[in-house]
Swiss-Prot record:
Encoding gene (name): rplQ
Family in the record: Belongs to the bacterial ribosomal protein bL17 family.
GO terms for cellular component: cytosolic large ribosomal subunit
Presence of the UniProt keyword Ribonucleoprotein in the record: yes
Domain of life: Bacteria
Protein's name according to its UniProt entry: Large ribosomal subunit protein bL17
Length: 130
């Protein structure tokens, strides 16, 4: 019985799942919007939001915790120098999930996950890329 077990398995073992979400979290912090399947986007929210909350108080200990979760110094720097101050007045809800149809190959539901206070220039950049 799987009583009280939270989180989705996504047909992966635990190390693969951890590596996948670490990479996806880094991509989301770097680009501030990514396109993925809807279940992955919903699960990624549970990884990224605590990282941004951690980045709101800049300390060596918090930077080390963020590095332990992302393993990327560039991402840690962006979290604490840009995203932490940007979301300082917001009490959670840093990401937005937008459904965007179904994937052609397997009809999987797709979604964009983005940071809510993204700048307009990045929105135009994504629109021109597609």
């Amino acid at each position: 019985m799987r009583h009280r077990k939270s989180g989705r398995q996504l047909n992966r073992n635990s190390s693969h799942r951890q590596a996948m979400f670490r990479n996806m979290a880094s991509s989301l912090v770097r680009h501030e919007i990514i396109k993925t399947t809807l279940p992955k986007a919903k699960e990624l929210r549970r990884v990224v939001e605590p990282l941004i909350t951690l980045a709101k108080t800049d300390s060596v200990a918090n930077r080390r915790l963020a590095f332990a979760r992302t393993r990327d110094n560039e991402i840690v720097a962006k979290l604490f120098n840009e995203l932490g101050p940007r979301f300082a007045s917001r009490a959670g809800g840093y990401t937005r999930i937008l459904k965007c149809g179904f994937r052609a190959g397997d009809n999987a539901p797709m979604a964009y996950i983005e940071l809510v206070d993204r700048s307009v220039s990045q929105t135009e950049e994504v629109a021109t890329a597609e």
